[in-house]
Swiss-Prot record:
Signal peptide: none annotated. Consists of three domains: the N-terminal catalytic domain, the editing domain and the C-terminal anticodon-binding domain. Keywords: Aminoacyl-tRNA synthetase, ATP-binding, Cytoplasm, Ligase, Nucleotide-binding, Protein biosynthesis. This is Proline--tRNA ligase. It is found in: Cytoplasm. GO terms for molecular function: aminoacyl-tRNA deacylase activity; ATP binding; proline-tRNA ligase activity. It is an enzyme of class 6 (ligase). Catalyzes the attachment of proline to tRNA(Pro) in a two-step reaction: proline is first activated by ATP to form Pro-AMP and then transferred to the acceptor end of tRNA(Pro). As ProRS can inadvertently accommodate and process non-cognate amino acids such as alanine and cysteine, to avoid such errors it has two additional distinct editing activities against alanine. One activity is designated as 'pretransfer' editing and involves the tRNA(Pro)-independent hydrolysis of activated Ala-AMP. Coiled coil: none annotated. Belongs to the class-II aminoacyl-tRNA synthetase family. ProS type 1 subfamily. It holds the Pfam family HGTP_anticodon. Homodimer. Disulfide bonds: none annotated.
């Protein structure tokens, strides 16, 4: 058993002013963590005990399907150049040089390192499949660290990598991870949902995220209550309801009209008496496109066109264009590529690239504009718009694709029922990478026929601290939070209300010893503090059960409190262990 009087648990009555989300506030107030710098945290006793329990669960489930490794946190730049990601990762990667000038980085992820082991050690199909995992610190140069442990610069991850002979083998490894993740998050007591996701810089095809709904989340999830469809907003699609088209004016051809001072969509809609869905919105970007070898990159112009009531999904647009970063066009770039000022941009008269990334203007049309007619668009001229604009007749594009955010109330892409959109935090992610890394890094094995083939890869990640954070977000009230027994720093706290009373002290000591003998992880609150202080601390720090050893103990009873429900029951001292077993069975 642990004695609170001997522990360092620096609880706070008030959260620091810069703590915004509930989990951040309570992690600080409960003494789980302390901040060292922006996005950099120290884990104190209670925090580390919870992290250790989470790691234990993850390790138990991963050992059922894979083998644990531990890889370096410092990587040579050349390894990342081989995969092409030295450029792709941009400013998110911590980069450094050693005293000899060799370029290095702090690992954000370990696909390259694992693939390097595979290409040097795997020779035959007989050595496949392989699943290798590690639990290791990762580093990311977050531009705006925030929300406590949700957006940090150093974080603990379980990352695993599978190597299979073919796609069928990858599917099996992927399914093994899916089952393992469900077991892990269930054992950690989380209410989670599995959603379709974008692969991003990881590459590959299939991708799913494991998400926990919370207002502190930075992701948006679109879901359907009827059929179960769920997807991250970066991936979500929807069915659009038909909209009424504007009547054509004049001869029905594009008509240049004066619209002085009507740069905003809301203004032009009011000025012309129309709805935003009849406007063509233009969002102009410069996109950073990496070279094939990943060593260099160029900036290419992109004009995205979509309905005036829709919003660009930049993740989708990046994927369509094959870029790593987007930034808005500056005034001189607008003049060069769009031949007009912001607020009056439109597609009529533009010369789109014949194919993506050929150095000319990449015009991307959202699918929501296909088949529309008699729309209003900027004329690429200050204070002027066109009306009667019909896509395909009056302008062309380089590529048409889904580049918009799905919105609440739009139709589910599977069954058509209205979608719901809610915030969530990602706790795990699984990817089917394919041969992206084995091809670029030259990993080969001989198949059954003696032919060289590239192993097919998957990668799979779990954010360890995010499990703790998500649990606190799901389980808190005004007084603090409670954790599931499986990941709480202690299973139960025995609170002696008056240490000056020898009878109570002995009863508390005896009860704590009995609970420990029964297999519980016990904290004995033997501090020389008022009972009220002890109760407040116990409510704050996440321990799921509490025995109060107080006045009723003189009658042979103790009060058993369940933190999650704030319910209590009086039980006989000699039946206390059995009472707790009944609650934790």
């Amino acid at each position: 058993m642990h004695r609170w009087s001997r522990l360092f648990v620096p609880t706070l009555r008030e959260a620091p002013s810069d703590a915004e989300v509930a989990s951040h506030k309570f992690l600080l107030r409960s003494g789980y963590i302390r901040q060292l710098g922006a996005g950099i945290y120290s884990y104190l006793l209670f925090g580390q005990r919870s992290i250790n329990k989470i790691v234990g669960i993850v390790r138990e489930e991963m050992d059922k399907i894979g083998q644990e490794f531990l890889l370096p946190a410092i990587h040579p730049a050349d390894l990342w150049r081989e995969s092409g990601r030295w450029t792709v990762m941009g400013d998110n990667m911590f980069r450094l040089k050693d005293r000899k000038g060799a370029e290095l980085c702090l690992g954000m992820t370990h696909e390259e390192v694992m693939t390097d082991i595979a290409r040097n050690e795997l020779r035959s199909y007989k050595q496949l499949p392989q699943i290798w995992y590690q639990i290791q610190n990762k580093f990311r140069d977050e531009p705006r660290p925030r929300s406590g442990l949700l957006r940090v610069r150093q974080f603990l991850m379980k990352d695993s990598y599978s190597f299979d002979l073919n796609q069928a083998g990858l599917d099996k490894s992927y399914d093994l991870h899916d089952a393992a993740y469900r077991a892990i998050f269930t054992r950690c007591g989380l209410n989670f949902v599995v959603v379709e996701a974008d692969s991003g810089a990881m590459g590959g095809s299939g991708s799913q995220e494991f998400m926990v709904y919370t207002d502190a989340g930075e992701d948006l999830i679109a879901s359907c209550a009827k059929c179960g469809y769920a997807a991250n907003m970066e991936k979500a699609t929807s069915k659009l309801a038909p909209v009424e088209e504007l009547a054509a004016t004049g001869d029905g051809q594009p008509e240049l009209i004066s619209t002085p001072g009507q740069a905003a969509i809301a203004d032009i809609c009011k000025f012309l008496g129309m709805q935003p869905h009849s406007d063509i919105k233009c969002v102009a970007y410069m996109a950073e496109v990496p070279s094939e070898d990943g060593k260099t990159s160029t900036w290419e112009p992109v004009a995205a066109f979509l309905r005036g009531d829709h919003f660009v999904n930049e993740t989708k647009l990046l994927a369509v264009v094959g870029a790593t970063e987007l930034r808005p066009m500056q005034a001189e770039e607008l003049e060069k590529w769009m031949h007009g000022p912001a607020g009056y941009l439109g597609p009529v008269g533009l010369t789109p690239a014949k194919k993506l990334r050929d150095g000319s203007l990449n015009v991307v049309l959202d699918l929501g504009l296909e088949g529309r007619r008699n729309l209003v668009a900027g004329a690429n001229k200050l204070d002027y718009h066109y009306r009667n604009v019909t896509p395909g007749r009056d302008f062309t594009w380089t590529v048409a694709a889904d580049i918009r955010n799905a919105a609440e109330g739009e139709g589910c892409p599977v069954c058509g029922e209205p979608l719901k959109v809610a915030k969530a935090v990602e706790i795990g992610h699984i990817f089917k990478l394919g041969t992206k890394y084995t091809e670029s890094m030259g990993a080969r094995v001989l198949d059954e026929n003696g032919k060289e083939v590239m192993p097919v890869m998957g990668c799979y990640g779990i954010g360890i601290e995010r499990i703790l954070t998500a649990s606190i977000e799901q389980n808190n009230d005004a007084n603090g939070f409670w954790l599931p027994r499986s990941i709480a720093p202690f299973d139960v706290v025995v609170t002696i209300t008056n240490m000056a009373d020898e009878t109570l002290r002995q009863a508390g000591e005896a009860l704590a010893a009995q609970l420990e003998a029964a297999g519980y992880d016990v904290l004995l609150d033997d501090r020389e503090e008022r009972a009220g202080v002890k109760f407040k601390d116990a409510d704050l720090v996440g321990i799921p059960y509490r025995f109060n050893v107080g006045k009723k103990t003189l009658e042979g009873k103790t009060e058993l409190v369940t933190r999650a429900t704030a319910s209590s029951q009086d039980v006989a001292l000699d039946a206390a262990v059995e009472a707790l077993k009944a609650l934790t069975a």
